[in-house]
Each structure stands twice: as structure tokens, then as C-alpha cells.
Amino acid sequence: MSVTRTLRETDRRLTGRTASRVPAGCGKVLSAVEECAESSKLWCCAAVVMAACGGRRGRLAAAAGLTALAVAQLAANGVCKQLADRPRPPKELIPHDEVEDRPDSSSFPSGHTAAAVAFTAAVAPTVPAAGALCAVPAALIAVERVQSGAHYPSDVVAGAVIGLGSAWLTRNAPRSAARLWAS
């Protein structure tokens, strides 16, 4: 069996298991968190609170978080989704009615997860407490994307990798550019 086929089958199996094992009450909480994060509302609100209440460090963290989020959204939704035309998980894998409310865009990668991880990872080095608080909804969003049938687990993992890369780039590119400029 090929590696690609094994990955596809594992993705399908994990999608079905995740969607069927989340209790109904938890599914509603996951959906509510995802709704708050839709169009990056949750992360923009978090940035406003950090900038308003966190002093200079809060403003730096908010700027880093929003910049990383924008980079992640561009990479995930503007580039990767356009290149990878992967269909959403089939409805028969999802044993609940939330499967009807899914985007029409490519499944790969998860833009919600990319944005959540990017914001969280960019904020955490400057304001660790805010990073820890943001990690909770970020993790819930990642689980929700699979549980709702919007994504396969590999889409979510790819989104998380894009988010981490965007945060790293946001935090390190300015220093690298300054060093190059100075030399």
C-alpha cells in the first residue's frame, strides 16, 4: 500500500472517530468557539485587550499576533487553498447534522487553525500568560474543524504548521532584515 493511500485512509478513520466521539454538549461549545473565531474576530478582540491593558509589551504582542495571523491567512487561504483542491470530508464520515454547514473552498489546509496557531505562537513569547490563554481556544478550534466535518486531521496539522511558520517569520524576519541592512 502506498504512503499516500495510507495517509488518506488514516485521515478518514480519524475524521470519523473524532466526529463521533465528541459528546453533544461539547460539540456545541466547540461550535461556539469556532463562531467567535470566524473572520478572526476572537483574535482581533484579544489583540485589542492586550494593546489596551498590557502596556508596551501588550501592544508588541498584539502587533506580532495580528501580523502573524495575516501572514498565516495569506499563506493558507490565499496560496495553499488555491493550489490544493482537496474536497471536504465526505458526509457519511460525520454522524451529526453539522456537516451541512461547511465551506465550499478546498479542505487543505485549515485556515482557522493556521490563524489561531499563528496568533497564539506570536503572542506567547512576549506575554506568556496571554499565549497560554489563547492556546485554549486555538486547540478547541483545531478539534472543532475535524469534529464538524470541515477538515481532515492532516488539514488541521498543515494549518498548525503554517501558523507556527507565520509566527516564527513574524518574530524573526524584522531582526534578520535589520542585521542584513546593518552589514
Locations of the language-model features?
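N-terminal transmembrane-helix/juxtamembrane module of multi-pass inner/ER membrane proteins
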Residues: 1-44, 77-105
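Membrane-interface elements of multi-pass transporters and channels
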Residues: 21, 56, 78, 82-91, ...
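Membrane-helix interface segments
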Residues: 25-26, 56-61, 90, 127-132, ...
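Alpha-helical transmembrane segments
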Residues: 36-42, 66, 130-136
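Hydrophobic/aromatic residues in alpha-helical transmembrane segments
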Residues: 45, 75-76, 119, 136
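Alpha-helical membrane-inserting segments
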Residues: 49, 71, 75-80, 84, ...
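Interfacial segments of alpha-helical transmembrane regions
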Residues: 50-75
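Membrane-embedded catalytic cores of phosphoryl/pyrophosphoryl-handling enzymes
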Residues: 93-183
